[in-house]
Amino acid sequence: GYGRLGTIGDALGIELCEPLTFKGRMGTGSPGGRDPYADPALRLGGQEWRKYRYTYRLWGRLLYNPDADPETWRRFLRAQYGAAANAVEQALGAASRVLPLITVVHGLSGSNNAYWPEIYTDMPIVEGPHAEHFRRDTDGPPTFTGASSFDPSMFYRIDDYADDVVAGRRDGRYGADVVAGWFETLADTAERDLALARTQVADPSDPEFRRLEIDVTVQAGLGRFFAGKYRAGLAYALYLRTKDRAYLQEAVSAYERARAAWAGIVEVTEPVYRANLTFGTGLTGHGHW
């Protein structure tokens, strides 16, 4: 993991930004401080860092010692969630892999001012809205299928993968269908273990559990959105190359699944998060799902 590889190339370790480092930057602060919640029951009373106690514990322990005893974080989970501790750990373990996977396979920009995968500004499969925003830091064409990963030696661009599929060749890199499968597996695992946690936790309405439940649901939804988007992008790219309408129908169906996943995120977050989460001034610096 990060701790074990943090000294690769003579690096001195890993530098972390506290999760709300940029909240309210560039003059975008608002009444209520850094608390992201609109729901009074979930607000943290000026102690927003408490939401991330488990995050800090994992990073601190495992950056210092990649072989740390799991008991050092599991006792915290037992204290917080009782009999649901193991299910919570498993749900978070799957859900927390979704955003790092999105970030590496869908490399829209290396700038945090231009790319916010948590609250994604949709990059169209066909050139359309926001094209100029993406064009600044993305090789053309500024479409979802034309976007590179941050590790192009490991992952195909969708357009390049479609070219190779049609030509009947492969070069060993991971394609869009494989990536979509990973997103689906992570979402399935997170949702399964979260459902188990709901049945085991003493009080499912407890704010500590509700905050976790909402965020795991959102991350699983992001996994399903990007799974559908990758499958839609690949099917559409194959349609353009073959003119086989079956691929076009497949693209539409996959995109409908992606849209449904995104709508599910909106349904979950709209009542609980503030309407405008401000981390900056640009298109990808503030907003809501």
How should these model regions be labeled?
Residues 18-286:
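C-terminal non-catalytic alpha-helical accessory regions
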